[in-house]
Amino acid sequence: MSIVKSKIRTIPDYPKPGILFRDITSLLLDPEGLALTIGTFVNRYQGKGITKVAGIEARGFLTGAPLAFQLGVGFIPIRKKGKLPSETVSEEYDLEYGKDVIEVHKDSIQPGDKILLMDDLIATGGTMIAAVKLLKKLGAEIYEAGVIIDLPDLGGRKKLQEELKVPVFSICEFEGH
């Protein structure tokens, strides 16, 4: 998917020195790139028995919601603590300096739901691992995690696949951080 990769802008030293930030807003602005991205996911997941798509706040919403629409299934927003109005279930996870918490509405998943988990990219895998654990608490089966970008040097895909047995599909990879 070199077309999709070519539409992703790299911002050096953001948000801190030494980081190469992979910015998907340039991809979202491009009608061809956006259509190709969503179309790639639709083609991969159509007819797989997925019952819901879950997206991790905030960039996972950008592919997850249109994909859910195209697949004819519901969308589950996974949000930071305190952002959902109804009863929630939460999962804490480690950050580089501290901890964070993500939540999902308790009634958004039925036992046996076959969930596709979406985000814009996978780096170290910390947030994605927490999201998988959160969804499994409610009885969901995770079909796969789908991302636009994999940063394989940071090991997130490997962790998700080895520790939680969740396959990861990415449209493109970038080396480095």
UniProtKB/Swiss-Prot annotation:
| Cited PROSITE patterns | PUR_PYR_PR_TRANSFER
Subunit comment: Homodimer.
Family, similarity comment: Belongs to the purine/pyrimidine phosphoribosyltransferase family.
GO terms for molecular function, please?
adenine binding; adenine phosphoribosyltransferase activity; AMP binding
| Gene label | apt
Compartments where found:
Cytoplasm
Q: Which organism is it from?
A: Leptospira interrogans serogroup Icterohaemorrhagiae serovar Lai (strain 56601)
PANTHER family per UniProt: ADENINE PHOSPHORIBOSYLTRANSFERASE, PHOSPHORIBOSYLTRANSFERASE DOMAIN-CONTAINING PROTEIN
What name has this protein been given in UniProt? Answer: Adenine phosphoribosyltransferase
Q: What is its EC number?
A: 2.4.2.7
